[in-house]
C-alpha cells in the first residue's frame, strides 16, 4: 500500500471514530460542549496526542493541549480546533481541524 493510501485510510478512520461520538438524543452530529460525548471526544484527542509522543494534557478550561518540544529558540507551529459541535452540527464540525492537527 502506498503512503498516500495509508494516510487516507488513517484520516478517514480518525474522522469516522470521532464522528461516532455523538448524542443519540440530538439531531445531526451533536457533541455539545461540556456534555458526556464532548468529554469523550476530548479524551479521544488526548489519547491520540499521547500516541504520537506529545506531552498532552487537558487544562482547567477543558482544552486539550499537545506539545512536541523542538529546538530551543526554534520557530513554533500552533494549530487549533474544537471537538464539540453546535447542536445538530454537521459531521465535520470541528473534526477536520482536530484530525488535521493530529495528522
Task: Specify the residue positions occupied by each region the protein language model found.
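Proline/glycine-enriched tight loop/beta-turn segments at coil->beta junctions
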Residues: 71-76
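Alpha-helical metal-binding/catalytic segments enriched in His/Glu/Asp
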Residues: 79, 89-103
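Histidine-centered divalent metal-coordination motifs
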Residues: 82
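Glycine-rich phosphate/pyrophosphate-binding beta-alpha loops
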Residues: 85
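N-terminal capping segment at the start of a domain
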Residues: 2-35
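A non-catalytic alpha/beta surface segment that caps or lines the substrate-entry region
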Residues: 23-69
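Predominant activation on well-ordered alpha-helical scaffold segments within soluble catalytic domains
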Residues: 12-16, 46, 98-102
Amino acid at each position: 500500500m502506498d503512503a498516500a493510501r495509508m494516510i487516507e485510510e488513517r484520516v478517514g478512520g480518525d474522522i469516522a471514530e470521532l464522528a461516532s461520538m455523538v448524542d443519540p438524543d440530538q439531531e445531526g452530529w451533536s457533541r455539545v460542549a461540556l456534555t458526556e460525548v464532548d468529554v469523550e471526544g476530548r479524551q479521544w484527542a488526548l489519547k491520540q496526542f499521547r500516541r504520537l509522543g506529545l506531552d498532552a494534557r487537558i487544562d482547567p478550561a477543558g482544552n486539550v493541549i499537545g506539545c512536541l518540544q523542538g529546538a530551543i529558540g526554534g520557530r513554533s507551529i500552533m494549530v487549533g480546533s474544537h471537538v464539540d459541535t453546535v447542536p445538530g452540527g454537521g459531521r465535520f464540525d470541528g473534526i477536520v481541524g482536530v484530525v488535521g492537527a493530529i495528522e
